[in-house]
Amino acid sequence: MVAPHESQRVADSCSHLVGREIGCSRDLAGCRRCTSEGRACSYSRSGVIHRTRRRNRANQDVTRSALYSSNTTPQTISDQATGRPCEGADNTETAYDRLQQIIPSRSHQSVRVIAELLEEYTEAWQGSEAFEKLSKAPIAEFFVFSEPQTRCWLDNLNLILEKEELLIFTIPPEVYAQLASSRPQEVQDRSWLVMFYSVAIYVEHSKAQNTHRVATLSKLRRNLWLAFNDVRLLIEPSPARIQALIILATYVEEFMTPCVCWSLITKACTMLQALGIVHWRLDTATSDVRAMLFWRLNMLDKALALILCRAPAFHREMSSQIAMPTLNRLMQCRPKRTKDYPPALFEAHYLHQMHLVSCIMADVWHALYGQDTEKVQEVKERLEAWYRQAKEVIEAAALVERPLLTAKGAAAVDLGRQTLRFQYLSLVVLLTVSSRQLRSQSIGPSQEMLNLLSALGDAIPDHKGPYACLLWQYLHCPLAAFGALWGELVMKTTANPEQSLKSMEAIAHLPLYLGKLGSRHALAARLQSITARIVEQARMIVNSQEAPEALPVQDEPTNPGLPAPAAEILPIVAPNESLDPTQMQPVDDFLDDRFIMQSDPFFGTTFDWFAWGGNLEV
């Protein structure tokens, strides 16, 4: 029983705190003010103030669903809030359901058709058919080829090693002799077989189509799979294995998928960290070469992390502790030139700008999916400052050196300038569509990016040089702009006819652009078909003069069990007075969730979940 004077102290403490945010007294453990008032206690005597997470949408979604479910239990709510699948749960939300959340006032038949196309897009992007072709009809012994063929492929491998400047610049003499004489079974390190057959496939794939070429590619494919059938390639770090993973991921595009490419590059990054980059026991030359490779991998790592919404392999603090190669260093490492390649100065400036933008890409990733979600505007300003400077430098270098080049070299420089703009616009679109405050600014950059595709698509298919992005960047980056514009068209067909016309013209460029990339990968051809039909359905909605009528209840779209469509192709709609303001708030809330990573029991929801110790020596 509490003494009278003790009760008076409790009452005084609670009265003193009336109107304050914290409802409990720090003086006494006997305060029951929160309980008596029926409010949640926000004070913890362990020293932690418990506040509701600002962007924790999971609990809100669970609460909303609980209102419509009579058999929801506390355990069910707990499982849903933590991302664990409930027993007997059936995740059958379709793309049409998601579109209806965004555009509830639209019931046009084309909306249902577009929803089915989004399901088809998801299946295409996440498909593994390309990689499954690589493992088809495996063999137990290597096919052998004539000596002229093998020497041609070896010469190309030497040229690529010299051009890429990874870790090893030439083929070891004993490996060269074994491969030239068609004795692959005698090569001890399978990494060289993976590099050799990857380059051989790349060389043969660029030749004209004929029966002999098809048979040769089939044998090379099976040889590559047999060479890759060595677990040491993935678990035992070595310079040759890192190099093999990079060449496999970037040169055998025909048999790659976005996820497989990400896995290979991530493994290469992990192995490089395991070997050490700036370890004190390494000599200067080795540290310099590994630092160069770090910056090369950092570009690929951050690009794939943004494409697939995965955590980067390299922590962003590493870029501040590993010295960026200087322009003089980049110029010195450029190998001997032929007349078809641009001088070293332009390429050095371009690579330097790519190293700089890889740091900004890390900031973009953290602004979208990490801990810096409140710094979107700040990251956007840094991105714009980088682009202003990069454009001046690249244009000046091109102005000086382009007149000295052949037509092929000049075309390569033009591609570099276009790719720089392409990289910048893709990041601007990602930042603006992910921020509620900046979402209205996404339409202009989206239109500009899609209009850029006409010229860019003519230069990409036949070019494999220092100014080219990963194929997956060329396929993926325009999709965010595409989703922003067709969503704008579907939501506001009559709000601004002139703007709708510009958006329609812009989205029409994407199918044509993807068609030009169809020769490089079957995924491009499939995406071209899907986006062309989305454009047609959007055009039907724009051209429709009658008010849309409610659709009757129909069967669910095909493939209802597929994962939710990739966020990039879903519509992004900027708030506008022409829309019902009572509907825009749920729209913004829904779109905000598109840029939050799914709950993962290993990584959690952010990348910076561990403390970075600053030790790169591994």
From Swiss-Prot:
Sorted UniProt keywords: DNA-binding, Metal-binding, Nucleus, Transcription, Transcription regulation
Gene Ontology terms: cellular component: nucleus
Biased composition, class Polar residues, residue ranges: 59-81
Source organism, top-level taxon: Eukaryota
CDD domains hit by this protein: fungal_TF_MHR
Keyword Transcription: yes
UniProt region (Disordered), positions on chain: 52-87
Subcellular location: Nucleus
Entry keyword Lipid metabolism: no
Single GO MF annotation: DNA binding
DNA-binding region listed in the record: 14-41
Main location: nucleus
InterPro entries named among the record's database cross-references: AtrR-like
The protein's role, per its UniProt record: Transcriptional regulator; part of the ergochrome gene cluster responsible for the typical purple-black color of the ergot sclerotia. The ergochrome gene cluster produces several ergot pigments including the yellow ergochrome secalonic acid and its derivatives, as well as the red anthraquinones endocrocin and clavorubin.
Protein name as it appears in the record: Transcriptional regulator CPUR_05421
